[in-house]
A protein has these predicted regions:
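Hydrophobic alpha-helical transmembrane segments
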Residues: 1-71, 115-231
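Acidic (Asp/Glu-rich) catalytic motifs at the cytosolic membrane interface
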Residues: 71-115, 141-145, 211-215
């Protein structure tokens, strides 16, 4: 199978930190030892998400493990964000392999993360499950749109993976001080509230993306005009 047969999708990222992050990643990629390649970074990202989930689960009995979760989130950012940049800087792009492996790893990573949160006591298992379903549904939509429209969207509403990691890290550190939040006179788990808000945001994003992409595809491939009556 020739790589020339594959048309790589146009990457679109409008997140708040895109330009700053790109400069940082290029700086890091140009300074990594030659023996480190993009596959090493991808596997590091997967291991980091596994350890993030383990850290959350340990935090049920050892709250300071939340600090470890934040550290592993940072390691995940390093591996997940840098693997593609390193491949492009060195001219070692593998468009099909990279796209497939990167996003399979992402799916397992989110599963590890939310499983850890479900076991942590800081997020209800039902909330974690709902958030996982919403994430997977939006991911499926993004992958289908990438195939059909050859546009790969890396962010929505100014948020991409990096911004989401930052929000999660800040929320995780906040758990050390108070794992609950007061809403309308009732106390709720902070990560239950955050998880429900994230699920709602993903669901709204999914609906908006589906409507936009169905419209674009219909305009590109409309039904043939009906023959006039009597002809």
């Amino acid at each position: 199978m020739s790589a020339t047969q594959f048309d790589e999708a146009r990457r679109v990222s409008t997140s708040v930190l895109t330009s700053s992050e790109r400069r940082c990643l290029l700086w890091l990629a140009s300074r990594l030892p030659r023996w480190i390649n993009s596959d090493h970074l991808t596997m590091l990202a997967l291991l980091a998400m596994l350890m993030t989930g383990v850290s959350y689960s340990l935090a049920r009995s050892h709250p300071l493990a939340l600090v470890l979760a934040v550290v592993w989130l940072a390691v995940n950012w390093f591996g997940d964000s840098l693997d593609g940049t390193l491949a492009r800087v060195r001219g070692h792009q593998r468009p099909r392999y990279g796209f497939y492996v990167d996003h399979v790893v992402d799916c397992f990573g989110v599963l590890f993360l939310l499983a850890g949160l479900a076991l942590s006591g800081y997020m209800s298992p039902l909330v974690a499950m709902g958030l996982l379903v919403a994430y997977f549904m939006l991911s499926i939509e993004v992958y289908l749109a990438t195939y059909c429209l050859t546009v790969f969207r890396l962010s929505f509403w100014g948020f991409g993976p990096t911004e989401l990691r930052l929000v999660l890290a800040i929320g995780t550190l906040a758990l050390l001080f108070d794992p609950t939040v007061d809403l309308v006179g009732q106390r709720y788990r902070l990560f239950d509230v955050g998880g429900l808000a994230a699920t709602a945001g993903l669901a709204i994003t999914l609906v908006v993306a589906v409507i936009r992409n169905v419209r674009a595809l219909y305009q590109a491939e409309p039904l043939p005009a009906l023959a006039k009556a009597g002809r």
